[in-house]
Curated annotation (Swiss-Prot):
GO terms for cellular component: glutamyl-tRNA(Gln) amidotransferase complex. The active site is at residues 78, 158, 182. It comes from Xanthobacter autotrophicus (strain ATCC BAA-1158 / Py2). The lineage of its organism: Bacteria, Pseudomonadati, Pseudomonadota, Alphaproteobacteria, Hyphomicrobiales. This is Glutamyl-tRNA(Gln) amidotransferase subunit A. Heterotrimer of A, B and C subunits. It catalyses: L-glutamyl-tRNA(Gln) + L-glutamine + ATP + H2O = L-glutaminyl-tRNA(Gln) + L-glutamate + ADP + phosphate + H(+).
Length: 494
């Protein structure tokens, strides 16, 4: 029998339903794997007692025939999601030991459907980063290594703990958040599937805010079908989030395996950028061939404002972050550093409580929102954002069903390799992903191959608003044609 932790979420669901094993047995297997994988630093908090209690409840419900769609399935939760009575810090020192008295809407949906909480997963501080190196708990180490090289690699960010945990078989699936690529980029770096749904598809209530007009929750999974199962549970209308859209959630699982014959797939010429590696270019061409062989029509398209997306994003996102993070003052919750008066206390608390990357983004955001520069930077960036959205609207109006692009400009890089370099070099990791957030569209990253030195490479599919089903159908075609890419050597177990 396949090791319990190696089962896909879909296989685990079937095994539980058929009584082949219990949720307690499955949960214990994951808890043991988590214990052996602490060198990866994927979890910032393990919750074994809660997990086993939830698993026992699931087993009772399974025995009585009252099962939910995720009954008994052990999941990891990114530390950006508030979990009632369970420490939630956004991996920031300023929120050290914060224990929320409420549950995020997304996680409450997962518990409603029977899922089991294994623990809280590491991420970049306040989700600001592309490598999971800015966390107050230290960097996450990718379960992947280059062939013949023991250099520790980043799992991507900001949802690096989620990606690493799913890839290393430390949970059956995980939640992530995506503001500029924080689900899709780590998914591509770790050989996992990650989807950022349409803005408004999942509630943001109870998720620590980074950039409110860009943030969106989504799942990580080992297969396209598993991601579809998770998104169905996570999504849904929530009156507590004014940006959450009141429309029915489709059965995404039904879309997996559906025919893509006649679907029109756009290849944007602007994404062929200077310095893009030959292997990424070849992977992109092969991905288009996979879709064409399955009956899709491949067409060249133009998204002319793509070149302005990254600079516009790095104005809009820090501006919103500086506003959202103004609430962390040391008075109401979290870390507090004393001062002679209230102003000095604020200054000391924020200087000590925020890491360098978060401080950088707050300063950029405050600068671009200042009276003298608002029109020159922030207002202009918002105009560019409108033009990016218009580019996609025009392409979709021409009958294009989805857009195929690379997910990242390179495979994973070494820990420390880019963190100390020019920050712009790190920001360039998001070059293929930020347009999706700026336009509020759904995007999925799916593993499509391995680099010359044996690291995962992913492709990205971008869809029309609220047409995630199309993305699942197309991603499954790539998954079937390219194969899956599990981590083959579990070096962290010694």
């Amino acid at each position: 029998m396949t090791k319990l932790t190696q089962l896909t979420l879909t296989q685990a669901r079937e095994g539980l339903a058929q009584g082949e094993f219990t949720s307690v047995e499955l949960t214990e297997a994951y808890l043991k794997a988590m214990e052996q994988a602490r060198p990866l630093n994927a979890y910032v908090l393990e919750t074994p007692e809660i997990a086993l209690e939830m698993a026992k409840e699931s087993d009772r419900r399974i025995a009585s025939g009252e099962t939910g769609p995720l009954e008994g399935i052990p999941l990891g939760i990114k530390d950006m999601f508030a979990t009632e009575g369970v420490r939630t810090t956004a991996c920031a020192k300023i929120l050290d030991n914060f224990i929320p008295q409420y549950e995020s809407t997304v996680t409450s949906h997962l518990w409603r459907d029977g899922a089991v909480l294994l623990g809280k997963l590491n991420n970049d501080e306040f989700a600001m980063g592309s490598s999971n190196e800015t966390s107050a708990f230290g960097p996450v180490v990718s379960p992947w290594r280059r062939d013949g090289d023991e250099t520790p690699l980043v799992p991507g960010g900001s949802s690096g703990g989620s990606a690493a945990a799913v890839a290393a078989f430390l949970c059956a699936g995980a939640t992530g958040t995506d503001t500029g690529g924080s689900i899709r980029q780590p998914a591509a770096f770790t050989g996992t599937v990650g989807i950022k749904p349409t803005y408004g598809r999942c509630s943001r209530w109870g998720i620590v805010a980074f950039a409110s007009s860009l943030d969106q929750a989504g799942p990580f999974a080992r297969t396209v079908n598993d991601a579809a199962v998770l998104l169905k549970s996570m999504a849904g209308y929530d009156p507590k989030d004014s940006t959450c859209v009141n429309r029915p959630v489709p059965d995404y699982e039904e879309a997996v395996g559906a025919s893509i014959k006649g679907k029109k797939i756009g290849i944007p010429r602007e994404y062929r950028m200077d310095g893009m590696s030959d292997e990424i270019d070849a992977l992109w061409t092969e991905g288009a061939r996979f879709l064409k062989d399955a009956g899709a029509e491949i067409v060249d398209i133009s998204l002319p404002h793509t070149q302005y997306a990254l600079p516009a994003y790095y104005i809009v996102a820090p501006a919103e972050a500086s506003s959202n993070l103004a609430r962390y003052d040391g008075v109401r919750f979290g870390e507090r550093v004393p001062g002679r008066d209230v102003v000095e206390m604020y200054e000391n608390t924020r200087a000590a409580g925020f890491g360098p990357e978060v401080r950088r983004r707050i300063m950029i955001g405050t600068y671009v929102l200042s009276a003298g520069y608002y029109d020159a930077y922030y207002l202009r960036a918002q105009k560019v954002r409108s033009l990016i959205k218009r580019d996609f609207d025009q392409v979709f109006a021409q009958g294009v069903d989805a857009v195929l692009t690379p997910a990242t400009p390179s495979p994973a890089f070494g820990i420390g390799e880019k963190l100390k370099a020019d920050p712009v070099e790190m920001y360039l990791n998001d070059v293929f992903t930020v347009t999706v957030n700026m336009a509020g569209l759904p995007g999925i990253a799916v593993p499509a191959g391995l680099s010359a030195d044996g690291l995962p490479l992913g492709l990205q599919l971008i869809g029309r608003p609220f047409e995630e089903e199309t993305l699942f159908s197309l991603a499954e075609v790539i998954e079937e044609a390219a194969g899956r890419f599990p981590v083959d050597k579990q070096w962290w177990r010694g």
